[in-house]
């Protein structure tokens, strides 16, 4: 165990185009092999598509999509006397954001559209309307936590 304590949180750089740290985080999640300009082109293309399709600020639509994806509960494995229990725990806000972005990008990559920009755009639109694979993942996570509620007293 390290004795220095937790590593300090680094500030998220605010995105120059939309002025939102959420957009920066999304770009960082889309980023592959250090190709930041490609990731920015994908995200900015999806944001412009959101502006065209919804007719309002894409950052608002992104926030609404993330609110629909963010989990409030998850399960963690806890070993007690030879048995492993899935213990439901509440998700901290920072982790909820990270999970939402991770699921959004992961399920965008798994979609069938031709370009990543289209995939991300359509997953964002679906999520903002309460549909899509990322929202289903959240529902499944909540369902797992609900079905394992009996083990909540093993929380640490």
Swiss-Prot record:
Q: What is the role of the protein in this entry?
A: One of the primary rRNA binding proteins, it binds directly to 16S rRNA where it nucleates assembly of the head domain of the 30S subunit. Is located at the subunit interface close to the decoding center, probably blocks exit of the E-site tRNA.
Q: Which family does it belong to?
A: Belongs to the universal ribosomal protein uS7 family.
On assembly, the entry states: Part of the 30S ribosomal subunit. Contacts proteins S9 and S11.
Keyword terms of this UniProt record: Ribonucleoprotein, Ribosomal protein, RNA-binding, rRNA-binding, tRNA-binding
Which named protein is this?
A: Small ribosomal subunit protein uS7
Example GO molecular function term?
structural constituent of ribosome
Biological process (GO) annotations held by this record are: ribosomal small subunit assembly; translation
List the InterPro entries hit by this protein, alphabetically.
Ribosomal_uS7 (IPR000235), Ribosomal_uS7_bac/org-type (IPR005717), Ribosomal_uS7_CS (IPR020606), Ribosomal_uS7_dom (IPR023798), Ribosomal_uS7_dom_sf (IPR036823)
| NCBIfam families xrefs | rpsG_bact (TIGR01029)
User: At the top level of its lineage, which domain of life is listed?
Assistant: Bacteria
Note the Gene3D superfamilies from the entry.
Answer: Ribosomal protein S7 domain (1.10.455.10)
SUPFAM superfamilies annotated for this entry? Ribosomal protein S7
GO terms for cellular component? cytosolic small ribosomal subunit; ribosome
């Amino acid at each position: 165990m390290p004795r220095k304590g937790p590593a300090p949180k680094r500030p998220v750089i605010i995105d120059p185009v939309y002025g939102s740290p959420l957009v920066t985080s999304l770009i960082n999640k889309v980023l592959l092999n250090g190709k930041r300009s490609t990731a920015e082109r994908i995200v900015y293309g999806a944001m412009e598509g959101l502006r065209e399709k919804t007719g309002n600020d894409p950052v608002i639509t992104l926030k609404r999509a993330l609110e629909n994806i963010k989990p409030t509960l998850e399960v963690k494995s806890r070993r007690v006397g030879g048995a492993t229990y899935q213990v439901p725990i509440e998700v901290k806000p920072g982790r909820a954001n990270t999970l939402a972005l991770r699921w959004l990008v992961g399920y965008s990559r798994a979609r069938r559209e031709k370009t990543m920009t289209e995939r991300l755009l359509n997953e964002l639109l679906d999520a903002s309307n309460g549909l899509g694979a990322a929202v289903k993942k959240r529902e499944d996570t909540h369902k797992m936590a609900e079905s394992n509620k009996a083990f909540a007293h093993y929380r640490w």
